[in-house]
Amino acid sequence: MRRSLAPSQRGPMRPESRHSFTPPLLKKNKRSCQQELEREQELDRKRQSALRDASNTMDLPLPIRFTANSEYERAIAKVLARKFKVPMDNYVPDYGGKRVLGVRRCISRRPLHDPVACNALVLFNPPAYTEHERMGMDPTKVLVHVVVDPLLSNILRPHQREGVRFMYECVEGKRGNFNGCIMADEMGLGKTLQCVTLVWTLLRQGPECKPTINKAIVVSPSSLVKNWEKEFTKWLQGRLLCLPMEGGTKENTIRALEQFSMTSSRLGTPVLLISYETFRIYAEILCKYEVGMVICDEGHRLKNSDNLTYQALMGLKTKRRVLLSGTPIQNDLTEYYSLVNFVNPEMLGTAAVFKRNFESAILRGQNTDSTEGERQRAIEKTQELIGLVDQCIIRRTNQILTKYLPVKFEMVICAKLTSIQLELYTNFLKSDQVRRSLADCNEKASLTALADITTLKKICSHPDLIYEKITAREKGFENSQNVLPSNYNTKDLNPELSGKFMLLDFMLAAIRADGNDKVVLISNYTQTLDLFEQLARKRKYGFVRLDGTMSIKKRSKVVDRFNDPESDSFLFMLSSKAGGCGLNLIGANRLFMFDPDWNPANDEQAMARVWRDGQKKPCYIYRMVASGSIEEKILQRQTHKKSLSSTIIDNNESAEKHFTRDDLKDLFTFDADILSDTHEKLKCKRCVQNVQVKPPPDNTDCTSHLSQWYHCSNNRGLPDNILAQAWTDCKCVSFVFHHRSQAQEIVAIAEEAASEQPEEKPDRRKRPSTPPSDDSADEDFLGF
C-alpha cells in the first residue's frame, strides 16, 4: 500500500538548523543519563574528600562503612577502595568503550591440527614457554606446532613418517645450512605418498600460523604426470587441485603456465605437474617468478649437469628442492656430485673443488696399482664425503616391505640353447667379425664389439631376431643359412627354436590352466615384444602392450584396464626402456625378465612393478638367461657391481665401451656343456658337484648375493610348482638360483583382506634352521 505524502501523515519536519535533529523522546533519555552521570561523579568526589579529611565523618553512601574512628579502620577502608590492577606488563584495560564494531580482535594462535591427538605426526615443536612468558609476548609472533593432516598421518607407515619428517627438516633448513634433500628409497616404499604429505603440509600451515609455501612444481617423466595427479586425488580425496600439463596446444600451455607463475596467492591449482621435456621447453616462463618448492621424480635423470634439463631446473627460483630416485646411489662421483649439487648448490663446493678434495683421491685409491697410503686416504675421503651428504640423503631398502606385503620369490633360470641357437652362436664366435673385434682396441673396434654383443643377445632370445642378418649374409652369418630349417617362417613363431621361449611357453600354459594369476613380460627390445605378441595370439591369450610408441594418455588407461580383476587381459608386455619406472602393475603377481640389462638398476626398476603396495598375492619373479652365454656374463657383472658398490654406468652411455681386451675375450667365450657359468665362477663351497649340500644362512633373502641363494641343478626344492613342472616337461632348464623375501609368508586371501586384523598363517615351506655359516660367504663375494 502506498504511503500518503500529506502533512498529517508525515513525521515532524527537521528544523532548519545546522544542528542535527534529535527526536523528543531521545532528548529526554539523553538528559536523564547525563544527570545520573553527574550525580555519580559528585558522590565520588565527596568520598575521596572524606577519606582525606580524617576529622570529618560524613554520612555518605560509601562502598565500605565503618563506625570506629581509628587509623586501622581507615587503612582497611583505603585498601578496599583501591581499584584492581591486572598484574601484567603493559596491560591496557578495555571497559568496552574503545571497542569499535567491525574491527577484528586479536586472538591467540593455534595449530591447524591437534598436536597431542592419537597418531599425530608433529613436524615442528615451538619453544616451550611458561604461562608468564607467554602473557608478556606479542600474540601475533607466537610460534605454533606444525602437525600433519590426520587424513594422511593415520595411513602413513613408520618409515614413511620418518621420511616426511626428514624431508620437512631439510627443506626448512633444520638439519643444516641447506634446503634440499634426496629421497633415495628403493621402489615400492611410498615416495609419492611421502611427497604428497609434504606438499599438503607446506601449502596449509607453518610455524608462523600461515602457509609455508603458496605453490609447488612436480617434475617427472611424461609417463608419470597423470599418475601424480591420481596420487594427489587418491590420498587427499579431492581437497587439492593440481594443474597437469599434458597435451594441449602451445598457446593454451603458455597461458596456463603464465597464470600459474604470476599468481602469488590464493591459487586455485597450487601444484603444477609437468614433464621434464615440457619444463625444458617452457623454462623461460617458469623461471621468471619464485616458487615455493620443486620435486623432481626419477631424479637420476639429472646426474649429468651439462644437459639442458638440468640447467633449466637449476634456473628455477626456489631454495626448496627434493629429488626422488629409487635407483641405488653408487659411487660414480661425477653423477653423485651432480645430484647433491642440484638439491643443495655449493654444499660440496664447485666441481673443481670437489674433484680436488674428493674425486681424485678416491679414484686413485681404487686403482689396482695404488699404494697402501693411497688406499687409506681414499677410505678417509670416502667417509668424509659420506658424512657430508648423509645430512641430506635418506635411503631405505625394500626389506621394510616384508612387514606389509606378501612373500616374493625370485628365481634366476639358466635355460639351455637349442641346437639351432647353439650352432648360430658358435659360428658367430668363430667368424672373422669377432676375431677383428678382439684384435683391435680403438674406438671403432669397440663400437663393432658392441654390435657383436647385441647380436649374441638376440641369438639367445630367438633366431627370428637375426633372420634378416642371416638371409642378407651379413658378416658373421655368411654360412648360417643352411642352419635354419627349410620351412622356416618368421610369420609363424616357433617356440621350439629357442630354449627360453620354449620354457616361457610351457610356464604360461601352466599358469593359465592353474588359476587366475596374471603375468608381466619384460624385455629390453621391442622386437622381442613382437615375438611375445605372436605367441599370445597363437595361444589365444588376452594381452596389452606398452612401449615407447604408446601415448601418455593411453598408458594410464592400459594400466588401469590390466589391473582390473574383471579384465580378460592375461599378459602385460612391457618395454623396460619405456615403462620401467613408476608403473604399478599389482594386477599381476608373476613377472618374467626375459633378457638382462647391463645396468642392474634398470632391471631392478622393471622387476619392482608387481611387488608393491596393494599386492595381495605371493609374487614370483623369473629372470631368464641362456646357460653359459653372453647373458650370464651380463648377470655376473650386475652382481659384481651391486656387491662391491662399484661405479654405475651412465644410462646414456653403453657399458660395453669401457671393456678392455681381456674383458671382451671373456665375454666372447662360451662353454656349451656347462650348467651355469655363474655358479662355476662362484666356486660355491655349499655345493658338491653342482648339488647343494648346505642351505644358505638363515639371515639371507633375495637381496643377498647370489652365492647366498639356493642353488638347484634339478627341480627338487623349488618354491614354484609351475617352474618345477616346466623343468620336467620341456627339459630346457640347466640350473636355477632362488630365494625369497622373508622367512614367513603373509597369506592375503579375500576373506582376510576384508577383515580388520588378518591372521598370519605360517609358511609351509619354511627353511630349516642351519648353523651359522663359515667365512666362505665373504670369499664368494669376490667370485666374479
Curated annotation (Swiss-Prot):
Residues 1-54, 751-784 are annotated as: Disordered. Its EC number is 3.6.4.-. The modification Phosphothreonine is found at T22. A motif (DEGH box) lies at residues 297-300. ATP binds at D185, E186, M187, G188, L189, G190, K191, T192. GO terms for molecular function: ATP binding; ATP hydrolysis activity; ATP-dependent chromatin remodeler activity; DNA binding; DNA translocase activity; helicase activity. PROSITE patterns: HELICASE_ATP_BIND_1 (PS51192), HELICASE_CTER (PS51194). SUPFAM superfamilies: P-loop containing nucleoside triphosphate hydrolases. Residues 172-346 form the Helicase ATP-binding domain. Residues 2-9 are annotated as: Required for chromatin remodeling, strand pairing activities and coupling of ATPase activity. Residues 503-660 form the Helicase C-terminal domain. One of its GO terms (cellular component) is nucleus. The keyword ATP-binding applies. Keywords: ATP-binding, Cell cycle, Cell division, DNA damage, DNA repair, DNA-binding, Helicase, Hydrolase, Meiosis, Mitosis, Nucleotide-binding, Nucleus, Phosphoprotein. Residues 775-784 have a biased composition (Acidic residues). SMART domains: DEXDc (SM00487), HELICc (SM00490). GO terms for biological process: cell division; chromatin remodeling; DNA synthesis involved in double-strand break repair via homologous recombination; double-strand break repair via homologous recombination; double-strand break repair via synthesis-dependent strand annealing; meiotic DNA repair synthesis; oocyte fate determination; oogenesis. The modification Phosphoserine is found at S20. Residues 36-47 have a biased composition (Basic and acidic residues). It comes from the Eukaryota. Belongs to the SNF2/RAD54 helicase family. Interacts (via N-terminus) with spn-A/Rad51. This is DNA repair and recombination protein RAD54-like. It comes from Drosophila yakuba. The lineage of its organism: Eukaryota, Metazoa, Ecdysozoa, Arthropoda, Hexapoda.
